């Protein structure tokens, strides 16, 4: 049996790569997170540089005190906020909504959840093997 590829299927996949990720902050406020393909070269490079900052955060040990864990959590939020300033249409509103969470660990998890959703939804993926 041969595989049949349709232009419509290709179109759908290509459009998905260029579509923004929409994050609803409230009933009337939505923030768009632009995919890397829609960013200019300087902005793309800046996003990559921001992600390199994660290497500067030391690994946590099981016996680290709560204050240190909270400090690292806030560092994670600061790094991800830099990325949001580059990719979001309304970065101040997005960051303000995330910063409403008072617990630094939960806040860091929220930041990471939004970032990971953006990464997952806008990934470029790998080329599919050609049918032989």
From Swiss-Prot:
Entry-linked InterPro entries: Gp24/Gp25
Annotated organism of origin: Mycobacterium phage L5
Function of the protein: Promotes tail assembly by creating a scaffold for the tail tube proteins. The tail assembly proteins Gp24 and Gp25 would wrap the linear tape measure protein to create a tail assembly scaffold. It would allow polymerization of tail tube protein during which Gp24 and Gp25 are released and therefore are absent from the mature virion. The tail assembly protein Gp25 is produced by a rare -1 ribosomal frameshift. The ratio Gp24/Gp25 is important for proper tail assembly.
Family per similarity comment: Belongs to the L5likevirus tail assembly protein family.
Assigned keywords, A-Z: Viral release from host cell, Viral tail assembly
GO biological process, one term: viral translational frameshifting
Record note on quaternary structure: Interacts with tail assembly protein Gp25 and tape measure protein.
Protein name: Tail assembly protein Gp24
């Amino acid at each position: 049996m041969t595989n049949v590829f349709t232009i419509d299927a290709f179109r759908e996949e290509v459009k998905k790569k260029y579509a923004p990720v929409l994050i609803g902050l409230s009933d009337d406020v939505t923030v768009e997170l632009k995919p890397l393909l829609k960013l200019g070269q300087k902005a793309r490079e800046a996003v990559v540089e921001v992600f390199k900052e994660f290497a500067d955060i030391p690994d946590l040990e099981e016996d680290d005190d709560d204050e240190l864990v909270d400090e690292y959590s806030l560092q994670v939020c600061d790094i991800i906020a830099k990325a949001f300033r580059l990719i979001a249409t309304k970065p101040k509103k997005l960051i303000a909504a995330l910063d409403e969470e008072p617990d630094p660990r939960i806040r860091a998890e929220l930041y990471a959840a939004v970032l990971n959703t953006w990464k997952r939804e806008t990934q470029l993926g790998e080329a599919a093997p050609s049918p032989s």
